[in-house]
Amino acid sequence: MDKIYISNQVKLEILRICGQPTHKAYNLPGNLTLDIFNYGYNEELCRILEQKLQEIASQYQTGKIILPGDVCKNHTVSECIKMVFA
């Protein structure tokens, strides 16, 4: 699958999980940290994102495994994207 498509899917999930508008998820800059989107105030959001990243990795058979605790508020959007690629 196209890496750009998967990257945009990750960006969409980052925004969707925290309740932000998703209509232009593809424009989300890679250098933004998750705490900007309130992931720092609610640890459960990180756990949900981990599950979604694992679903994306499994769906597109990237070979990556995302475990509980792998995502934290200090991760950037780019780091989250890299988690799903082998």
Region locations from a protein language model:
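Phosphopantetheine-dependent thiolation modules in NRPS/PKS and related acyl-activating systems
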Residues: 1-55, 60-86
